[in-house]
């Protein structure tokens, strides 16, 4: 059995820890069979090949939640780079949870997502759901609550460009530097942006979605980890982007616009000017996990 789980853009614009969407590339792929012990083999990026692997953590978590004994032999094709801002740990965690669910015959969304979040917490120190949830559902997702699980979904299908520089931004550090309180004016601005962005998504107005890619809650404090952001953001807009923003906690950047190849090239060249190579993905939003 084999499951493919996509990369995700979390913290989409003003929706810190709430908005997220799956994208077509890159992705993680997990093959698995029942076994008499836990085993995991990894191809691609370097991640643990023992019980610390988040796919194993999540699969075990689901078995524990339902009181079942389970052992799997897994082979993980790891194409989403860790610490990329593209939901790497969330994708592997969800893959593990879905594998366990398939073997155990579990179809409960809440249980599967709860198990996947156990893997996410093991990796990042926080059980935030804005990678796991959109990867699971495949739509643009709005997390009202994780416990109980309440998710609002907006079907989307629009092209975008993602640029991934050869820089790492550790998720734990990116969360640690956030303040416990923000100014009232910033909170009000984010509410306004979030409401308008949801309206634009429901009407398919991608140009307005791009214009609303702004945040006052998290990004201002994370810029110390991404001093290059203003440079690449300007390069994207100068190349015709409707808007550009950080994916997750970075360093990946995504942008919306008409000529995505030109926009991606401009962002990559802006990184190259500071001595950093970058990969460019022309892909689509609105992709979820699926069985192969």
UniProtKB/Swiss-Prot annotation:
Main location: cytoplasm
Pathway of action: Amino-acid biosynthesis; L-threonine biosynthesis; L-threonine from L-aspartate: step 4/5
GO biological process, one term: threonine biosynthetic process
Residues reported in the UniProt entry to bind ATP: 81-91
This protein's UniProt keywords: Amino-acid biosynthesis, ATP-binding, Cytoplasm, Kinase, Nucleotide-binding, Threonine biosynthesis, Transferase
Subcellular location: Cytoplasm
Xref: InterPro entries: GHMP_kinase_C_dom (IPR013750), GHMP_kinase_C_sf (IPR036554), GHMP_kinase_N_dom (IPR006204), Homoserine_kinase (IPR000870), Ribosomal_Su5_D2-typ_SF (IPR020568), Ribsml_uS5_D2-typ_fold_subgr (IPR014721)
GO cellular component, as recorded: cytoplasm
EC id: 2.7.1.39
Catalytic activity as recorded in UniProt: L-homoserine + ATP = O-phospho-L-homoserine + ADP + H(+)
MF-aspect GO terms: ATP binding; homoserine kinase activity
Role played: Catalyzes the ATP-dependent phosphorylation of L-homoserine to L-homoserine phosphate.
Family: Belongs to the GHMP kinase family. Homoserine kinase subfamily.
Protein name as annotated: Homoserine kinase
